[in-house]
């Protein structure tokens, strides 16, 4: 395969894609910082970081690495067939974590 075929009809340039990714990344960091500040206001010791990858796997790996006693994870209310088809971070963590998992329903 020595041939290269240009993609036509796609207005998404690398520059636009990078800008969109940076915006997405910054929104995630802003949300994390907001939640971290809320926890600190309640005297809850916490840290926040944004890691690229599968959330459930990363949470389980990080908890094991940090020798955590418990993982607290939110659940947005997908149950039954919807959860099976779409997946759930809380469900993955519940079934794969090395420690106790507390799944908290989050308000809509």
Swiss-Prot record:
It comes from the Bacteria. Belongs to the universal stress protein A family. PANTHER family: ADENINE NUCLEOTIDE ALPHA HYDROLASES-LIKE SUPERFAMILY PROTEIN, USPA DOMAIN-CONTAINING PROTEIN. This is Universal stress protein Slr1101. It comes from Synechocystis sp. (strain ATCC 27184 / PCC 6803 / Kazusa).
């Amino acid at each position: 395969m020595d041939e290269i075929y240009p993609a036509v009809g796609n207005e998404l340039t690398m520059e636009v894609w990078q800008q969109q990714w940076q915006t997405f990344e910054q929104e995630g960091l802003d949300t994390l910082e907001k939640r971290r500040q809320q926890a600190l206001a309640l005297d809850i010791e916490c840290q926040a970081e944004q890691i690229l990858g599968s959330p459930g796997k990363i949470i389980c790996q990080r908890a094991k690495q940090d020798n955590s006693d418990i993982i607290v994870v939110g659940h947005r209310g997908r149950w039954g067939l919807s959860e099976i088809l779409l997946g759930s971070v809380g469900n993955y963590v519940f079934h794969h974590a090395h420690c106790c998992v507390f799944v908290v329903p989050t308000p809509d």
